[in-house]
């Protein structure tokens, strides 16, 4: 190649690394109503300025790459690039910053949580210039929200289907979670539903194992549902876990549930994936099935305070992808969950419009434009003594799920269900009478136990059980 040719080729083009902040840090930018906004907790490597770190996040999660490329000139980067438009230090933390990034809506495929996350939380989380990176919150614009179906049915439709109003719904996870035969499993389902629960549940890892194939479980659980309905006069359900190794097999299991006439199926949405979850949510709406969502694997993503993704983002994504219930922590049980932060994402699941509230970890105002809400499920290490607190914290639009707190009753499964139903009814009545559940909760349970021997026995068994560990999910 002649020197003259080299000179011509280099005119107006200099390959090499340039600072991201020159292109992607734009503090003068005014965000648009159609932008997706993200709040990242950024921990830069030593010597990397926060402006460069924030700009790197914006670049690597949108149009940027490590060097100047010829094809930048073939499109309008100014139209498509992400922009870091604000940076603030994290109070009480050294070298941590909240970096706000705006993404043009054209970067994302309509109706695809999968595509949205592939961009926003894709390769950028392995970027060497950052010691750690956490996505704290997203503002999803109404223009993008309207491209999603959302939950198959929503809270009001579920209440109408079940004919249950004015109280939280009661559930129970069948234990032991693995090892029971299908017939013994169905027996436990029947006893719990007959005792007064609204729902029973497959555990998240109950799929189709050698000791209990899925079709056998579905048949025995359906029999338990219809038998308990006939005896109690109440509509009952069991979360039949349709999660499978392929989307085709998952839909086949959901079709079987529909043909059996049961009201609800279940999916592990993180291990199953958002594409599978959205497909199942569409099937459930088309065929009148409610959809219970388990969040198995969430703590791998959201437990660390400085890296990963907060559960409020996963909760928003689930509402978009589709689900009628989702596990959301308990505040008082064995699983992670600080009260204000938990109630923040519970409101994001249920309400139509949520104002920005940094005290609860909500970084952006979110408008769901009438997308149906999702019932939060409180589950994990809870028992009858927790009932007043759970009723006060979560309110009526929730599912309170007692696994060991039902099946661990000294008299058996049905008395365990009776104890929970009596405790719930007592708390709801006391609240409706104007009593303070937070202050008088234990007294309310003691009063109810005087006329319910099942509740009295449960109170005695679990009177000393506490899970007193400091929550890691703090602001």
From Swiss-Prot:
CDD domains: RuBisCO_large_I (cd08212). The modification N-acetylproline is found at residue 3. The keyword Magnesium applies. Binds 1 Mg(2+) ion per subunit. Belongs to the RuBisCO large chain family. Type I subfamily. RuBisCO catalyzes two reactions: the carboxylation of D-ribulose 1,5-bisphosphate, the primary event in carbon dioxide fixation, as well as the oxidative fragmentation of the pentose substrate in the photorespiration process. Both reactions occur simultaneously and in competition at the same active site. Heterohexadecamer of 8 large chains and 8 small chains; disulfide-linked. The disulfide link is formed within the large subunit homodimers. This is Ribulose bisphosphate carboxylase large chain. It comes from Gossypium hirsutum (Upland cotton).
């Amino acid at each position: 190649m002649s020197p003259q040719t080299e000179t011509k080729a280099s005119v107006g083009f200099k390959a090499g690394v340039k600072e991201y902040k020159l292109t992607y840090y734009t503090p003068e930018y005014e965000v648009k109503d159609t932008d997706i906004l993200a709040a990242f907790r950024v921990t830069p490597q030593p010597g990397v300025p926060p402006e460069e770190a924030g700009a790197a996040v914006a670049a690597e999660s949108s149009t940027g790459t490590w060097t100047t490329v010829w094809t930048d000139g073939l499109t309008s980067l100014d139209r498509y690039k992400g922009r870091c438009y604000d940076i603030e230090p994290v109070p009480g933390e050294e070298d941590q910053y909240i970096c706000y990034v705006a993404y043009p809506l054209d970067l994302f495929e309509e109706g695809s949580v999968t595509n949205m996350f592939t961009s926003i939380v894709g390769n950028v989380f392995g970027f060497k210039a950052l010691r750690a990176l956490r996505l704290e919150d997203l503002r999803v614009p109404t223009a993008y929200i309207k491209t999603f179906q959302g939950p198959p049915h929503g809270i009001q439709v579920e209440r109408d289907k079940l004919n249950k109003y004015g109280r939280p719904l009661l559930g129970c996870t069948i234990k032991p979670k693995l090892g029971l035969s299908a017939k013994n499993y169905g027996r436990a389902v029947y006893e719990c539903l007959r005792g007064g629960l609204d729902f029973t549940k497959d555990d998240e890892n109950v799929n189709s194992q050698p000791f209990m194939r899925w079709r056998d479980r579905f048949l025995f659980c359906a029999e338990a549902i219809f038998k308990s309905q006939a005896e109690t006069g109440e509509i009952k359900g069991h979360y039949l876990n349709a999660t499978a190794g392929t989307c085709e097999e998952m839909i086949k299991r959901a079709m079987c549930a529909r043909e059996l006439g049961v009201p609800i199926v279940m999916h592990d949405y993180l291990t199953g994936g958002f594409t599978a979850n959205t497909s199942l949510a569409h099937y459930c709406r088309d065929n009148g099935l409610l959809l219970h969502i388990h969040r198995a694997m969430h703590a791998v993503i959201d437990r660390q305070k400085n890296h990963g993704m907060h559960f409020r983002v996963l909760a928003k994504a689930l509402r978009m992808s589709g689900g009628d219930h989702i596990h959301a922590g308990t505040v008082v049980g064995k699983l992670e969950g600080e009260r204000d932060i938990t109630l923040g994402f519970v409101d994001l699941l249920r309400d139509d419009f949520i104002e920005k509230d940094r005290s609860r970890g909500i970084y952006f105002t979110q408008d769901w434009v009438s997308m149906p809400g999702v019932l939060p499920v409180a589950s994990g290490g809870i028992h009858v003594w927790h009932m007043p607190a759970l009723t006060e914290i979560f309110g009526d639009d929730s599912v309170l799920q007692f696994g060991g707190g039902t099946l661990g009753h000294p008299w058996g499964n049905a008395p365990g269900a009776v104890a929970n139903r009596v405790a719930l009814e007592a708390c709801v009545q006391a609240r409706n009478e104007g009593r303070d559940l937070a202050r008088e909760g234990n007294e309310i349970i003691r009063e109810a136990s005087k006329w319910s021997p099942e509740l009295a026995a449960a109170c005695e068994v679990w009177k000393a059980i506490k899970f007193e560990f400091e929550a890691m999910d703090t602001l």
